[in-house]
Amino acid sequence: MRGSVRLSFVTLLAGIGLAGAASAADLATKAPAYRAPPVMLTNWSGLFIGVEGGGGWGRDSLFFPGPLTATGGFDTSGAVAGGVIGYNWQTPGSSWVFGLEGNFDWADIKGTTICPNPTFNCGTKIDQIHTATGRIGYAWDKVMVYGKGGYAWSNERAEVVVPGTGAINDATGWTGRDGYTLGAGLEYMFVPNWSAKIEYDYYHFDGKTRAANTPAGVFIENITMNSRDVNVVKAGLNYHFNWSPSPVLAKY
């Protein structure tokens, strides 16, 4: 009798132990795996405005169709500064960023050389450069690289200057020149809403012929401002409206 009781008691303990082990195994398999919290990436979409400034350089030349003479090529250089407005659209779930941008820059890019008449110096000066471009970029969270291209316009004049005095003997007056621009840059969103950029732009402007007059308005001759190239490197600061975290998640 005692043997039967002992056997039943041992059997009961074994059953309880097996049940506990099975329950523990179930708990172990059903415990949720730990997942790191999602990291939200920067969203570049939205309207932005900014300021920019830098320096430009290039080569220019002039042609005088009346006497059929021309200057040699001469260097031009100077500062640029202005503003920018644009809009970015980052494709959902992607790092690609597309945009439109307008730049409105004041400039002081100028240079001189000896005229065909060596009594005078000939030169040109750009005082404005404006552009309307499309942009395409690729973003790594807060950092974006981009390329741009589109229409460019400059306000320029040719001058004939009296050496030693700086007096303008005759000039074409300010005239607009059409062209195009290609550029590339790097932009960094250092805090929400604010980004800094560095950018290189190449400009090509078409040639244009204008009448050169004395300060009193008396016609002297025609001057052709030949087609020209300008290079500009600038830095800028942009403010982005309605910045918000992107639904794009960081990958582990």
What are these regions (language model features)?
Residues 2-252:
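Gram-negative outer-membrane beta-barrel domains
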